[in-house]
Every structure is written in structure tokens, then in C-alpha cells.
A protein has these predicted regions:
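N-terminal lobe/hinge region of extracytoplasmic solute-binding protein
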Residues: 1-48, 167
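Alpha-helical secondary-structure segments
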Residues: 70-72, 76-77, 123-125, 171, ...
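Surface-exposed binding/hinge segments that line
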Residues: 75, 89-150
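Gly/Pro-rich hinge or "lid" segments in bacterial periplasmic/extracellular proteins
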Residues: 128-198, 202
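Structural transition elements
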Residues: 294-336, 356-358
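Extracytoplasmic/peripheral linker and loop segments enriched in polar/acidic and small residues
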Residues: 374-387, 414-482, 504
């Protein structure tokens, strides 16, 4: 199902995928993954060396209830995102970038001081702390989308929890979603400014947890696209409608070191290092997934982001930070047990409950118990919604998670583990790490090479020095898609785009 469809509160890839079809911001990624003008009528007028941007909003941009989209809708939405009372998971996206966002998020300034202002209904002024190379990409993501204040306030807490409590300004409207059901429809939005380029009247979505069941629906023409893994890839790899591609999804396990001042056993670095080096990722990727995923020994995935000067891949540059090493894992683990005065430990691993997630967690359980003496792993497979919830409330010991990234820059991965990031949920906090990552968001923007070095160093601190995560793999995507389905647009990083989808 959909955890929620409010752009302010969204904190997971499922919600953002929905938001991307029914809402729109100043820019939208084009078919090649580059930001293209959307609600912005033209590129902004720049003042003060690029620190002030003035956007004209399209005259024909409207909400699905007929209201025009205005600068006030942006001003309202952005101020809500940085308001500490909202506790938006993505508030920190604006920190060090939009003027005063950092102080507002800390509660030192009022949200009204944020550097955004509607000069009139169709003119929007944005003030930045620093002109940032990734700002246009950020504007294509849900956190920076407008919201209709009158509608949102009328709905109150119900806003975005089912299709009746939403209005849209994007290519589609969401229909037939009651908040918990596993099917819904995207229906073409008649008030969308670019509706002439939206060829499809209706897209029906069904959530199918079991790949076998999904294949049956595909083979009986009830589904047009189905994602595959494991033995199904081997079975269908020669089918003319089979496709495989790499993505920018970084999949890892989080370890809970403690919260609210109460530490767990996993606050011990050696135990974390032992866990992080005890899984044969290549085995997992080749046998279980077989979908184009690759073993990953860092947080930032490979082949997508490159050094601005040398053009070298970030992942290759930073190398393997935590890789499978049975001997080293066992040694670190034994040392850690000694340090906490125990001879055995039981840990629970929380994850979603699709057939693939069950297979993965069984594989992980097997590897960890086999390679780390005295360890028992219990599995807790719950709905994806419950798994997101466990992450958000930091109510887990080990959690199978990951991050798809929002824009093509290492910052989108490393940002998550800042001390005050609402997406952190590990108990990790490191002053040097914060300094490097905040620098890369803000004041190092003017020196791309120095900024890049800061990001490389931050990842080393996160994994080599602190073993905050157990990196597993860079996600791939294998799927069958009917040959008459065209323009289903996906990107290595960022939400799919259904705007141009058509079926002949």
C-alpha cells in the first residue's frame, strides 16, 4: 500500500512515487533524467550572483479543484517543511541551501523567515544561502512541491491519507485509494497544464507481494509490467520482453545503537564491524536476486556519480569500506562480545514481507549465525508500512532498509546520517561527519573538487571508522514489460515518471 501521499510528510520511495504522478513542482525530470521546466514558465531571473531566483509560474497551472497554482502555494508548503512542529523527514533537504532553513529547523528562527516569498500570485522569489549546483534537481522532488493551503487546512490530519483527501496539480489524480487497500488508479487530470502530452486516461496499480502471483496476472494480460528476481530471472531471461537495468538504490541493514540516551549492545563498534563483514553479498546477489543488482561495499552506489575534475566514479575512488571477510568479521565479533561481557547475543532483524524480502532475510540470518559464534538472529517480517514505521520510530535492532536517492549526487545518500536528520534512526552522531556533509550542502558549493573530497571523507567516517550500516548491494531491476507499453520512464535515481506512458 501507500504509506501516505502528503509531499510534506513523505519519507519513503513508495510515497514519493505516488506524489510524482499526482503533483508537480517548478521542474520535472525529462525522459533523459534532466530537470525540465514544469510549473515554472521559464528559467528564473537571477540576482545577487545566483543567490536570489525569481520564477514566473505558468498562467495555466491549476489544481484539480480549479484553483490556480500560485506562489503562495509554494511559500506555504516550504515553510511547513522546515517548521520543527511538522517534523518533516525531508526538512533537512533545505538546510544550508534555502536561506535561514538551518536556523528554522533548529528552532532558532520562525518559519516565516525562510527565504521564499510570493511577490504576487504568479511570481515566486527564492533566496539561497549558497548557489547550489544540485538545486534544480532538488526542485523536481516532492519536498519542494507546492500545496494548496485552504484545501490542506480543511482536511487537517486526514490530508494525503486517502484519495478523497487529496487534490492534484500533476498529470494524474489519485482515485479509489482508501488508505489501506492494495489497488488504486491514476486518472488523467483534466486541469493539468500539459494534458495534451499525457496520452493515457487511466493507470490501474495492483500491489502483488508474491512474484509468482504477479507473473500469473502478467501472463493472463491483467498486468502490463512485472518485476522479477531469482529463479524467475533465469526462467524468463530469453523472453523478448525481458529487460534488466542497474539502479541507484543502496540496500543495507541499519543497526540501532540506542536512542534517548539509552545505549544498546550495538553501540559497540566491534560488534557492528563483525556484523558488517559477515555476509557473502556476492552469493546473495547472484543467486537470490539475479536482477542486475551488484554487491556494494559502501553507502554510495557506483557508476552514477563522478568526480567533477577527474571524472572518476565515486564508488571506485572510495573503494571497499566494509566487505565480506569471514576471518576479520569473526575476530571483531569475538572482541566485541568480550568488551560487553557476553558470550552470546540474540538480535531481531525486521523487514518487509514480500517473497523476496523473506528469502533475503533468511539468507542473511543463515550467514550471520554461521559466521559469528554465539549469535542468534530472529526474523520479523512485517508489512512494508509496518517496516517503515519501525524505522521511523527506531523500534528495531537490525532493519533491512535502503535508500534510492533523490538526485544524482553523493549528498543524497550521506545527508541521511547527519545528527539531526530525521532519517538517521541509528543513534549515530559525529561532529566531523556533520561538518563535512553540511559543508558539501552549503559553503563548499563554490569549490566542486573540495566539496567532492569532503563527501569521500564523510563516507569513510560513516563506514570505515564507525560501521554505522551493513552495506549489502546496489539494486538492479529486472522486469517483463508488454511490448505495446511505451514510455514507462524510470531513472537510476529518483521516482518513476508515468506522465508519458502509453499503450498501443
Amino acid at each position: 500500500g501507500i504509506p501516505n501521499a502528503s509531499p510534506t510528510l513523505a519519507d519513503n520511495s513508495v510515497s514519493f512515487r505516488v506524489i510524482n504522478q499526482i503533483f508537480e513542482g517548478l521542474y520535472r525530470l525529462d525522459k533523459n533524467g534532466k530537470p525540465a521546466l514544469a510549473l515554472a514558465a521559464s528559467e528564473p531571473e537571477e540576482k545577487d550572483g545566483g543567490k536570489t531566483l525569481i520564477f514566473k509560474i505558468r498562467e495555466d497551472a491549476n489544481w484539480s479543484n480549479g484553483d490556480p497554482v500560485t506562489g503562495h502555494d509554494f511559500e506555504y508548503a516550504w515553510k511547513k517543511v522546515v517548521d520543527p512542529k511538522t517534523a518533516a523527514a525531508y526538512g533537512p533537504q533545505m538546510e544550508e541551501i534555502v536561506k535561514n532553513a538551518t536556523q528554522i529547523l533548529k528552532g532558532e528562527m520562525s518559519p516565516d523567515e525562510l527565504g521564499i516569498k510570493a511577490l504576487d500570485d504568479k511570481t515566486l522569489q527564492i533566496e539561497l544561502e549558497n548557489p547550489v549546483p544540485i538545486f534544480k534537481e532538488l526542485l523536481t522532488t516532492g519536498t519542494f512541491f507546492p500545496q494548496n493551503q485552504a484545501f490542506v487546512e480543511k482536511q487537517g490530519d486526514r490530508y494525503g491519507t486517502k484519495s478523497d483527501t487529496l487534490i492534484s496539480n500533476g498529470p494524474y489524480k489519485l482515485e479509489n485509494w482508501n488508505g489501506t487497500n492494495m489497488t488504486w488508479d491514476y486518472v488523467k487530470n483534466p486541469t493539468y497544464w500539459d494534458k495534451k502530452n499525457v496520452p493515457t486516461e487511466k493507470i490501474h496499480v495492483t500491489v502483488v507481494k508474491d512474484t509468482n502471483a504477479a507473473l500469473n496476472l502478467y501472463n493472463t494480460n491483467k498486468l502490463d509490467r512485472v518485476e522479477l528476481d531469482g529463479e524467475f530471472v533465469k526462467q524468463y531471461k530469453d523472453d523478448k520482453n525481458f529487460h534488466k537495468e542497474a539502479t541507484g538504490r543502496s540496500v543495507y541493514m541499519k543497526m540501532n545503537q540506542g536512542k534517548d540516551g539509552v545505549k544498546t549492545d550495538l553501540a559497540n563498534l566491534n560488534l557492528r564491524r563483525g556484523l558488517a563483514m559477515a555476509i557473502d553479498k556476492t552469493g546473495m546477489v547472484n543467486t537470490l536476486l539475479a536482477n542486475g543488482s551488484k554487491a556494494l561495499n559502501g553507502d554510495v552506489p557506483g557508476d552514477i556519480m563522478f568526480d567533477p575534475e577527474t571524472k572518476e566514479d565515486f564508488r571506485k575512488q572510495n573503494g571497499d569500506l566494509l566487505k565480506f571477510d569471514q576471518q576479520e568479521a569473526t575476530n571483531a565479533w569475538k572482541q566485541g562480545l568480550k568488551e560487553i561481557g557476553k558470550t552470546e547475543l540474540t538480535l531481531t532483524l525486521t523487514s518487509g514481507d514480500t517473497s523476496l524480502q523473506r528469502k533475503q532475510t533468511e539468507f542473511i540470518q543463515n550467514q550471520l549465525e554461521e559466521n559469528l559464534p554465539g549469535l542468534t538472529i530472529k526474523l520479523k517480517n512485517v508489512t512494508n508500512q509496518a517496516s517503515f514505521q519501525a524505522d521511523v520510530t527506531q523500534d528495531f535492532e537490525l532493519l533491512l532498509g535502503g535508500w534510492g536517492g533523490d538526485y544524482q549526487d553523493p549528498l543524497t545518500y550521506l545527508n541521511l546520517f547527519l545528527t539531526n536528520s530525521p532519517g538517521n534512526h541509528t543513534g549515530f552522531s559525529d561532529a566531523k561527519y556533520d561538518e563535512l556533509v553540511l559543508g558539501a550542502k552549503g559553503k563548499l558549493s563554490a569549490d566542486p573538487e573540495k566539496r567532492w573530497q569532503a563527501l569521500l571523507e564523510a563516507e569513510q567516517i560513516l563506514l570505515k571508522d564507525n560501521a554505522v550500516l551493513i552495506p549489502l548491494y546496489q539494486g538492479g531491476r529486472a522486469y517483463l514489460q508488454k511490448s505495446n507499453l511505451k514510455n514507462y520512464t524510470t531513472y537510476p535515481i529518483g521516482s518513476e515518471n508515468y506522465k508519458w506512458i502509453e499503450k498501443n
